[in-house]
From Swiss-Prot:
Subcellular location field: Cell inner membrane; Bacterial flagellum basal body
Primary localization: membrane
Protein's UniProt name: Flagellar motor switch protein FliN
GO cellular component term, pick one: plasma membrane
Family label: Belongs to the FliN/MopA/SpaO family.
Superkingdom of the organism of origin: Bacteria
Pfam families (UniProt xref): FliMN_C (PF01052)
Described purpose of this protein according to its UniProt entry: FliN is one of three proteins (FliG, FliN, FliM) that form the rotor-mounted switch complex (C ring), located at the base of the basal body. This complex interacts with the CheY and CheZ chemotaxis proteins, in addition to contacting components of the motor that determine the direction of flagellar rotation.
Segments of this protein annotated with the region Disordered: 24-67
Protein species of origin: Pseudomonas aeruginosa (strain ATCC 15692 / DSM 22644 / CIP 104116 / JCM 14847 / LMG 12228 / 1C / PRS 101 / PAO1)
Example GO molecular function: cytoskeletal motor activity
Length: 157
């Protein structure tokens, strides 16, 4: 019985809220308010008045604006972007104490043996290995092993 009183009280409160809202709107008559109270505040849900768009209007292929003359990606745009290429002979970790003690003539031992190939890095990403050569009295590098594009992409992830 307590549950019935609770439901009735909730329905009455909902009906009172609707009546107050309709009274504020000013276009509600007393008959409308009485009808809402008689229904217990339950009002039928009205269907939306706007019709739904048929699914065939939303085709599977999007119709993006096209620029004339560009069928695929234009890779020429990125071919002139400068990149930094560097060769790494080797590396090592030292403490700041040892770093501060370095001076002219100090020797730093690296992790690679003499004659081992160098790492060729483009913007910090390893792309190849090579050996040092001299070209017109300048250092150069002869590539001995180039990493495949798929392996380079894997390293980026």
């Amino acid at each position: 019985m307590a549950d019935e009183e609770k439901v009735t009280t909730e329905e009455q409160a909902l009906a009172d809220e609707w009546a107050a809202a309709l009274a504020e709107a000013g276009d509600a008559s007393q008959d409308d308010i009485d009808a809402l109270m008689a229904q217990g505040g339950a009002t039928p849900v009205a269907e939306p008045s706007t019709p739904r768009a048929p699914m065939e209007e939303f085709g599977a292929s999007p119709k993006a604006p096209t620029i004339s003359g560009l069928e695929g990606p234009n890779l020429d745009v990125i071919l002139d972007i400068p990149v930094t290429i560097s060769m790494e002979v080797g590396h090592t970790d030292i403490s700041i104490r040892n770093l501060l003690q370095l001076n002219q003539g100090s020797v730093i031992e690296l992790d690679r043996l003499a004659g081992e190939p160098l790492d060729v890095l483009v913007n910090g990403t390893l792309i190849a290995h090579g050996e040092v050569v001299v070209v017109n009295e300048k250092f150069g590098i002869r590539l001995t092993d180039v990493i495949s594009p798929s392996e380079r992409i894997k390293k980026l992830r």
